[in-house]
Amino acid sequence: MTRDEALPDSHSAQNFYENYEPKEILGRGVSSVVRRCIHKPTCQEYAVKIIDITGGGSFSSEEVQELREATLKEVDILQKVSGHPNIIQLKDTYETNTFFFLVFDLMKRGELFDYLTEKVTLTEKETRKIMRALLEVVCTLHKLNIVHRDLKPENILLDDNMNIKLTDFGFSCQLQPGEKLREVCGTPSYLAPEIIQCSMDEGHPGYGKEVDMWSTGVIMYTLLAGSPPFWHRKQMLMLRMIMDGKYQFGSPEWDDYSDTVKDLVSRFLVVQPQDRCSAEEALAHPFFQEYVVEEVRHFSPRGKFKVICLTVLASVRIYYQYRRVKPVTREIVIRDPYALRPLRRLIDAYAFRIYGHWVKKGQQQNRAALFENTPKAVLLSLAEEEDF
């Protein structure tokens, strides 16, 4: 058993062990382990996040105090947003001299990232449901002046009905009126341009809640395309792409999506934060508008007859278009199989079945390797790297 797998001493954490029985590991963070646990009085399953604030004894006293304060701040924010249907619920907390135990709802469906790895890409309908719920969460947070700062598919959990729960508020912060942040934190491929600029320019005014909207745009693009909008194997070049806002709708997957969904993505991925779409504005976007039955006008008999005529004409036109379509021959399939939508999805699905184990298997492996993510990556000194 490794140090990470070892459980805290039962004597020092007596109150926790009296109420909960820890089980297998579900995930890991930089200084924490998430386990499934059983509530002894009710036999109910939960997830417990066990945070070692000493770093296994490697942290200095200042670092221990800093991590302790950060954990208390996370607990405070979770309590302030308690009750929201799409935010993970904090059920219980325990504290010792070296550990915190945070007990949450158990989301058995796992991370949105794993679901996306399995599905490759999502339909507009699936994306609409997930993004509407996520934007409603972000809207609630921003009304409380809370910025999450680490929005990504790994921090979005799913229940059995595909409802989402936002989790991991470790980087979250509640801003005072007019306050700006300068700390560089988050996951590289989801960082907003202004966060990167803060690390390079001491005179930069800082950033605010708008960084969450940029990350939301990256998530939406990734759900639809199956890969992030900004990616390069060299991290510095990827960060430059982010700062320049250089992305494209060039992959074949985008041919299957409407201009409406592309328009919403482009409103999120705006380099200047003041021009970026807010959560409230995004929810009013046509992509989320649906017909309400009561508001659909009733047709007159003449109108119904007109609809019938148009339907017949459309059916005839579709029939003749079908007759004119050239059959898919063996030569066409051999020449460009990826141009055919059914084959494209089949190829992608089998490619992920073959290579997916390289990404998400193994307890010590980074589950986000597919997108070059680094969980809890803090870019402390980008300016010390090669110049842009």
UniProtKB/Swiss-Prot annotation:
Signal peptide: none annotated. One of its GO terms (cellular component) is phosphorylase kinase complex. InterPro entries: Kinase-like_dom_sf (IPR011009), Phosph_kin_gamma (IPR002291), Prot_kinase_dom (IPR000719), Protein_kinase_ATP_BS (IPR017441), Ser/Thr_kinase_AS (IPR008271). Its EC number is 2.7.11.19, 2.7.11.1, 2.7.11.26. GO terms for molecular function: ATP binding; calmodulin binding; enzyme binding; phosphorylase kinase activity; protein serine kinase activity. Keywords: ATP-binding, Calmodulin-binding, Carbohydrate metabolism, Glycogen metabolism, Kinase, Muscle protein, Nucleotide-binding, Serine/threonine-protein kinase, Transferase. The active site is at residue 150. Residues 303-327 are annotated as: Calmodulin-binding (domain-N). It is an enzyme of class 2 (transferase). GO terms for biological process: glycogen metabolic process; signal transduction. It catalyses: 2 ATP + phosphorylase b = 2 ADP + phosphorylase a; L-seryl-[tau protein] + ATP = O-phospho-L-seryl-[tau protein] + ADP + H(+); L-threonyl-[tau protein] + ATP = O-phospho-L-threonyl-[tau protein] + ADP + H(+); L-seryl-[protein] + ATP = O-phospho-L-seryl-[protein] + ADP + H(+). Catalytic subunit of the phosphorylase b kinase (PHK), which mediates the neural and hormonal regulation of glycogen breakdown (glycogenolysis) by phosphorylating and thereby activating glycogen phosphorylase. In vitro, phosphorylates PYGM, TNNI3, MAPT/TAU, GAP43 and NRGN/RC3. The two calmodulin-binding domains appear to act in concert to bind a single molecule of calmodulin and are pseudosubstrate/autoinhibitory domains. This is Phosphorylase b kinase gamma catalytic chain, skeletal muscle/heart isoform. It comes from Rattus norvegicus.
